[in-house]
């Protein structure tokens, strides 16, 4: 009831929608359902500590409009588990642990074009669900040396931001302080599976939009969005499909 009242008050104040991160399932469902009843839109970064309780398929069924990143999407396609296969010493608050294990997630989901993979994709499309991909921020994990030495940083990235980007145990997502070829290989393979899903989602009529999530991991505003468009092209989008994701489909989503 408190969640429903909160959503109604949010609408009364003139909000266009709500950005969610996660909540206990009963509260999350009530808020999503009421938000949709009121004709408002919704977005969600599915917090990794909540996806075992509410993955993307479950939030979409309850009225979620769009998702960001990929959190909660592979989890919806698990066939032999309900929680990612974390090592026993995993510590979510350790950024190195968090992002190293994130690079091993997509291979734990159903294989591309398998029944489970197809069923999840087709249901999301039937729900008119939008995926806002944000390929670019995580691309640093495929090649840290390249990402940290891109030519525009010298002239366009503020010194304070460059300092924040340096490998660190404190700065969010600057997780490459103990990084090497094995992690980068995992992430390259992770991207292949992620991009396969996104490209096929688009091919079947699903709405995909471009988002940069700049401000972290050598991902700078302005430049990051162009990189995102390039990564959609890498995923298999035709150049016109890339432009549509950044324009028409983005407008439809909001």
Regions found by a protein language model. Give the residues of each.
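Active-site neighborhoods of metal-dependent hydrolases
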Residues: 6-17, 73-230, 234-235
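Mid-to-C-terminal alpha-helical segments outside catalytic/metal-binding sites
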Residues: 238-250
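Short, intrinsically disordered, charge-balanced linker/junction segments flanking boundaries
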Residues: 1-3, 251-254
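Generic hydrophobic/aromatic pocket-lining and core-packing "Φ" positions
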Residues: 7, 28, 32, 51-56, ...
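Active-site loop-helix segments enriched in His/Asp/Glu that coordinate
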Residues: 1, 15-97, 108-115, 211
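Short secondary-structure boundary/hinge segments and terminal tails
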Residues: 28, 52-54, 77-78, 141-142, ...
């Amino acid at each position: 009831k408190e969640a429903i009242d909160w959503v109604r008050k949010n609408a009364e104040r003139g909000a266009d929608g709500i950005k969610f991160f996660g909540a206990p399932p009963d509260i999350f469902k009530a808020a999503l359902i009421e938000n949709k009843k009121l004709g408002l839109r919704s977005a969600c970064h599915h917090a990794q500590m909540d996806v075992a309780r509410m993955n993307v398929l479950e939030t979409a069924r309850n009225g979620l409009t769009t998702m960001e990143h990929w959190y909660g999407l592979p989890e919806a396609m698990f066939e032999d588990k309900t929680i990612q296969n974390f090592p026993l010493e995993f510590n979510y608050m350790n950024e190195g642990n968090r992002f190293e294990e994130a690079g091993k997630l997509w291979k734990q989901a159903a294989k591309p074009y398998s029944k489970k993979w197809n069923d999840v994709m087709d249901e999301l499309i039937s729900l008119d669900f939008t995926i806002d991909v944000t390929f670019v921020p995580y691309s640093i994990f495929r090649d840290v040396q390249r990402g940290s030495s891109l030519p525009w940083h010298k002239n366009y990235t503020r010194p304070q931001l460059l300092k924040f980007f340096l490998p660190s145990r404190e700065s969010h997502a600057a997780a490459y302080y103990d990084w090497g070829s094995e992690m980068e290989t995992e992430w390259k393979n992770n991207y292949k599976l992620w991009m396969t899903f996104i490209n096929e989602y688009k091919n079947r009529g699903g709405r995909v939009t471009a988002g940069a999530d700049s401000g972290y991991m050598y991902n700078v505003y302005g430049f990051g969005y162009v990189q995102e468009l390039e990564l959609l092209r890498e995923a298999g989008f035709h150049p016109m499909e890339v432009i549509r994701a950044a324009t028409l489909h983005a407008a439809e989503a909001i």
